[in-house]
Amino acid sequence: LLGVFMTNRDSAGAAQLNLGLRPKKASLSFCDSASPTSARSLMAIGGKTIPMQNLEWVRTFRPLGALLGRLSPRLLRRIDPGLATLARPVDAFLGRLRGGDLESPAGLKVQEMSIPDFLAHAPRLIAHYAVRPLWSEDELGWLVGLAAQNTRLGAFTIRAIVDHTSATIGCFVYYASPGRTAHVLNILSLPGREVGVLGAMFRHLEDTGHLEARGRAQPALMAGLGLQRWLVFRHRAFAMALTRVPEVNDAIVRGDIYVGGLAGEDWSRLMCDFG
């Protein structure tokens, strides 16, 4: 856990903090919410950026409703409440013009996933990453329990994606908030099935009434995200990793590392309760 400290401009506090963060022989430190100042400090002592994960994707389902939802509460008080009602038919019309850009992938279905099932499947779905969390059932259950307490973004929800044989090929974890934004924490997939998993997820999120969905980019997801219309990327925060292990550094550079969501900081109430 790295906090924010203040020091006099002429003092050596910043340098001492940086030196204290230098990795030990076999340690790995990472952060997925680093500011430019923090990123520069970490790079000065050997830290590396994790490819793509500084980006947040935003997939819009109902453009006018999503735009109104982004307006500040202060501004919304000055807007006729009827605009929110007007947005629905306008978005429906835009949806017809847009056409069927969210067709469900053939043979894939989205199903409810219990926490015990998620605890059983999650390690298998990230096993192909060279650097990944070695979650035990107790550890992952503890994380899920804490994340579920964060209700500011919506209801903590887990869904599985199954193929025509009813085998689980992926799952996604998100804060559900129909009529608002779905905040996606994790998208887990067997290697090579990411495009189908993403397509099924976006179809489900639109069908359940969300205006838009947001989540973190990852190298393995870029092909599937790139196929989506009405999707944009924006810088969110730097994702950084710090280690002295050469093999781990190589994996970081090529993006063969799984961090973020439950394996990161986005679920923490510290990240959203004070915004």
Language-model regions, residue ranges each:
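Short, solvent-exposed coil/turn linker segments
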Residues: 108-114, 197, 218, 258-261, ...
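C-terminal functional modules
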Residues: 230-275
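Acyl-donor binding region in acyl/amide transferases
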Residues: 1-70, 175-239
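Intrinsic-disorder/low-complexity, polar/charged segments
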Residues: 60, 136, 191, 244-245
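Amide-forming acyltransferase catalytic core, primarily the GNAT-like/NAT-type
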Residues: 48-180
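A short, terminal or domain-edge coil/loop segment
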Residues: 82-94, 212-216, 238-239, 263-275
